[in-house]
Regions:
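Amphipathic alpha-helical assembly/interaction segments
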Residues: 1-144
Length: 144
């Protein structure tokens, strides 16, 4: 089925838009040292610095894998599998990102509700990526 020219519009890729929210949240948290009190130990400051670097690296990798997967329009089973691998890597990094936030909360002794919005955005991103992968399974079932 084709869409008439007057009814065409840009596709809003929700997982792509949400990715930028996750990035902005992380930058804000890092700038604020994850809400740690001013009198935290030097070891905790160093830990925050190390984990912050890994968090930003993971977020940039999520974006990279989303871009790579989205740039592959599968014409055969191999291309479909390659696209799926990149989707899976992005999904895995979302879980890893949540784990890093949990580790920081435990290290700093912050309350569970401190990063609710940020964690919610990551979970939403993960669900969007899974829905995208599921949609691909339906769209390209004749290739697999």
């Amino acid at each position: 089925m084709s869409v008439t020219k007057g009814n065409r519009r840009d596709s809003s890729v929700e997982f792509d838009n949400n990715y930028f929210k996750i990035h902005d949240d992380a930058v804000r948290l890092i700038r604020n040292k994850f809400g740690a009190s001013k009198d935290i130990r030097e070891e905790a400051v160093n830990y925050i610095r190390v984990v912050s670097s890994k968090i930003l690296s993971d977020i940039l990798d999520i974006g990279k894998y989303i871009r790579i997967a989205n740039s592959i329009y599968p014409k055969n089973k191999t291309e479909l599998e390659e696209r799926r691998v990149h989707q899976d890597k992005a999904i895995g990094l979302c879980y890893d990102l949540l784990t890093k936030y949990q580790l920081i909360m435990r290290t700093l002794g912050t309350k569970d509700d401190k990063y609710t919005v940020e964690a919610g955005n990551i979970v939403h991103e993960n669900n969007c990526l899974k829905a995208w992968r599921s949609s691909d399974n339906k769209r390209f079932k004749d290739l697999g």
